[in-house]
Structures are given as C-alpha cells and as structure tokens.
Amino acid sequence: MLTFLAIIVVAYLIGSIPTSIIAGKLLKGIDIREFGSGNAGGTNAFRVLGWKAGLVVTLIDIAKGTIAAVPVVGFFKAHPLGAFPDMNEIALSLIAGMAAVIGHVFTVFAGFKGGKGVSTAAGMLIGIAPVSMLMVIGIFLLAVTISRYVSVGSILAAIAFPLIIAIRKYVFDLGSGLDYRFFDHWFVHDSLDYHLLIFGGIVAVAIIYTHRANIKRLFSGTENRLSFGRKN
C-alpha cells in the first residue's frame, strides 16, 4: 500500500510542475493565466509567449505524463517501499499517469489552477502505447493544420485513440501488444491491453465534455484559430 501511495504522490507532484506559469514569469514577468484564454497550458503559451516557448512548454508537459506513467512506476517496482501493488501494470501506469494529469490541472504549486491536461495525458499514453499514440498525434497535427483549431485536433485525437487500440487489437489480432528492441538493450512495449481501451473511451468522453465550451464556439464561429505566423 505504501508503494502505491508513493507512486501516486510522486506522479502528482511531477504533474504539478506549472510549466507555462514558470515560463511566463521567466520570459515576460507575467502570470499566463491572466492573458489569452486564461489557461495554464501549452496552447495558451503558444498564444501569449510565442511558438518557441509554447513548444518547450508543451514538450515538458508531455514529458511529465510519460515520466509519471513509466519511469516512476519502474523505479518503485525496482525499489518498492514494502510490497509492490498486486495489480495489472498497465492499469498501475494509467493510474500514475492520471495522478500526473490531476497534478497538471490542479497544481499544488499554483493555487490548484493549472491547464486542461491534454498534453500530460498524451505523454502518459506515449509512454504506454507509443505506436498507437504516433497515429493519434498524426491525426491531431493533420486536424489542427487543416482547421487551425486546437480544440478540433484534441477532440478528434481523443476519439481516435480507443478506435485505434480496438482496431489493432481485434481487427489485426495483435493481442496485448508488441515489443520493440533498439540497440540490443533498449526495449519499448507498445501495449494494447484492454485497460487502455476502457480508459481511452472514458478519456474521449471526458475531453469532449471539457471542450463543450469550445464546441459551442466552433458552431457559433467564435472559437480562436491558431496562428502559424512567426512570433518569438
């Protein structure tokens, strides 16, 4: 039980690192939540701080989810504080990743007012199901490039993830996943565990729900478009 709690706490604290708020303070001396959309996430960092800072913020937010879901769980498996949790490891990684997402959304370091958690959730899934997530990222980038609406890309990507897992698992009969070997020593497991399918479906519904204001603005034509212009 102690090991499980330690995983949750460490993952939450990693997720709580307020990347965009720190970047706003360092680069412009501002609280990014008082500008743009008012959100402490990567998309608002692109709007307020420019594409370079926005890219760095987004990559760090993604890394928070990956680190929480894979290395943190792996570390405590190798160095448990008592018995290691007797549960499906993919489920444990998902729980740890979600602790990081909760930390990102309700960061203890910034008055529990953070971002929406999309990048951190994506990072968690990149660590657990990298091949499926590469496909999802491709769909996201294509949707954003064509529409210039990040919200459209986020919603379509959320819907695509459980569909891709289901198609690869049941249509192509790939079982619980595949292992990839790099440089003879580095192994990456691309999971297709059924926990991912259930989780992906829940996340898709949750992301559509959290983007309901964006959906209303899309239909009314008032949603902010992403500018690809050069801004430092």
From Swiss-Prot:
Principal location class? membrane
Where in or outside the cell it occurs: the entry states: Cell inner membrane
* Pathway named in the protein's UniProt entry: Lipid metabolism; phospholipid metabolism
Q: How does it sit in the membrane?
A: Multi-pass membrane protein
- The UniProt record lists the EC number as 2.3.1.275
Q: Which UniProt keywords apply?
A: Cell inner membrane, Cell membrane, Lipid biosynthesis, Lipid metabolism, Membrane, Phospholipid biosynthesis, Phospholipid metabolism, Transferase, Transmembrane, Transmembrane helix
Q: What are the TM regions of this chain, as residue ranges?
A: 4-24, 56-76, 90-110, 124-144, 152-172, 191-211
One example of the protein's molecular function in GO is: acyl-phosphate glycerol-3-phosphate acyltransferase activity
One of its GO biological process terms is: phospholipid biosynthetic process
Top-level division of the source organism's lineage: Bacteria
Q: List the disulfide bonds.
A: none
UniProt cross-references to Pfam families, sorted A to Z: G3P_acyltransf (PF02660)
Q: Which reaction does it catalyse?
A: an acyl phosphate + sn-glycerol 3-phosphate = a 1-acyl-sn-glycero-3-phosphate + phosphate
Q: In the UniProt record, which is one GO cellular component term?
A: plasma membrane
Q: Which InterPro entries match?
A: G3P_acylTferase_PlsY
Similarity section: Belongs to the PlsY family.
Q: Which HAMAP family does the protein's record reference?
A: PlsY (MF_01043)
According to the record's subunit comment, the protein's assembly and interactions are:
Probably interacts with PlsX.
Function comment:
Catalyzes the transfer of an acyl group from acyl-phosphate (acyl-PO(4)) to glycerol-3-phosphate (G3P) to form lysophosphatidic acid (LPA). This enzyme utilizes acyl-phosphate as fatty acyl donor, but not acyl-CoA or acyl-ACP.
- This protein's name: Glycerol-3-phosphate acyltransferase
Which organism encodes this protein?
A: Chlorobaculum tepidum (strain ATCC 49652 / DSM 12025 / NBRC 103806 / TLS)
Query: What gene makes this protein?
Result: plsY
